[in-house]
Swiss-Prot record:
This is 4-hydroxy-tetrahydrodipicolinate reductase. One of its GO terms (cellular component) is cytosol. It comes from Prochlorococcus marinus (strain NATL2A). The keyword Cytoplasm applies. The gene is dapB. NAD(+) binds at residues 14-19, 115-117.
Amino acid sequence: MSSANQSIPVLVAGAMGRMGSEVVKAINSSKDFQLVGAIDNQKDKEGQDIGSLLGLGELDVFLSSDFEGSLCAASQNVPKDGSNNGAVLVDFTHPKFAYKHTRTSIAYGVHPVIGTTGITADQLDDLSKFADKASLGSAIIPNFSVGMVLLQQAAAAAARFYEFAELTEMHHNKKADAPSGTCIKTAELIEEQRSNFNRSFVEEEESIKGSRGGSRASGLRLHSVRLPGLVAHQQVMFGSNGETYELSHNTIDRSAYMPGVLLVIKKIRSFNKLVYGLEKIL
């Protein structure tokens, strides 16, 4: 069988989490992929079959808390001929681990696909240089939803015509970072079309600090909501004399992200650099 027809070896970090468990299920349901590792810090479940833990039946893949050891094992799938057809890491862990996990994965020659948000602009620049040096396809994807990519493109197009805009993102109350990486990415795309927003006509005074949200250097304001019952929601509102223009996207189930996740896993091995954003893969 040619390497092009072989299943892609994948390990999942955060395999017991809300997103990670969905990825494990999606990987298991497709013949295009082979689950070779499951990583999570739940010590009480370490060594147990991830399939049994997630109700999938035994998969002969056992949960480990050893991130680097799992990468080392997966790196055995790295081809010796220099081609970028090795294993892929899908990471949905915690913002404080995102940078380290990405860099370590690249160092082991395992293609990182990072859905964990919280990577700073400086860290992104460093990781981009590191991936370039390694000539290893790597991906940092703030949001895997095709619908969100379409919203971002529409928002960027609208920014050419509106000088006033504010963004609101809403997530479940177990999300650690605010604003979300998706919201920041949307703001960045909008700012590529216009550098200054929301010039003030009055001297604003907040009676409760933070009432007006966080303001970026461009003047764009970002607002975050955290409540149980939410999954992921974003609204971009533009305003002008006599009208508002609103764009919104709502994720009601995490299965909506899986087509994007699987697409990136399939395509990232054909890259030799770091890509940021799903729109660079589509």
